[in-house]
């Protein structure tokens, strides 16, 4: 609350973690995705910057893709666990998967960027996909709860046309794919991991595509 302005938007205090995870915070526009996140010229304090934004839409009522939602969600988790996201994920996920500590961009306050900037090899992307394909189990150890895997892959919003690979639906930080039961993690410029539970399959690709996503499809 030390980052709140003196007269915050009434909807701001209604935002919950679940709203941030499914891109329904209510900010109604993409934030911390362009110049406002550019090193040296962007917002010097992401939390303070976001707390000052208007929230014209009721949280949870409408989808609007924005890196700011993921960034704020990561900050919320950090407060809950008392650790930076990099440390927490390394302990709970990356180390058990023998992934090491990934290169990850940080914001001006030193927080790992919850909205992107994590550099992984294709093999590491496949490992994370395999973890979710196995309902959170890795070599007999339950790394992530089955309930959470089910929750993140359940659509919170669905879109038309349903045949469009990029606009089928959205769960918790995962896009819903058109194949039955499938969902995927998308990274910038065509870094994609798709989990297809009914096929027992994970597909990961890395691609330097910057605009024509039909080529990625």
Describe the role of every protein-language-model region.
Residues 1-27, 52-54, 81-116, 120:
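Active-site helix/loop module of the DD-peptidase/beta-lactamase fold
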Residues 16-22, 64, 101-104, 119, ...:
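Structural recognition of the beta-strand scaffold that forms the well-ordered cores
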Residues 20, 63-93, 125-131, 200-203:
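Alpha-helical scaffold elements that line and support the substrate/ligand-binding pocket
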Residues 32, 39, 78-90, 136-144:
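Structural helix-adjacent loops and short alpha-helical linkers that scaffold large soluble proteins
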Residues 95-152:
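Active-site-proximal binding-pocket segments
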Residues 99-101, 149-202:
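Active-site Gly/Thr loop motif
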Residues 209-211:
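A short acidic/small-residue loop/turn micro-motif
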Residues 213-217:
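Short, gly/Ser/Thr-rich active-site loops of penicillin-recognizing serine hydrolases
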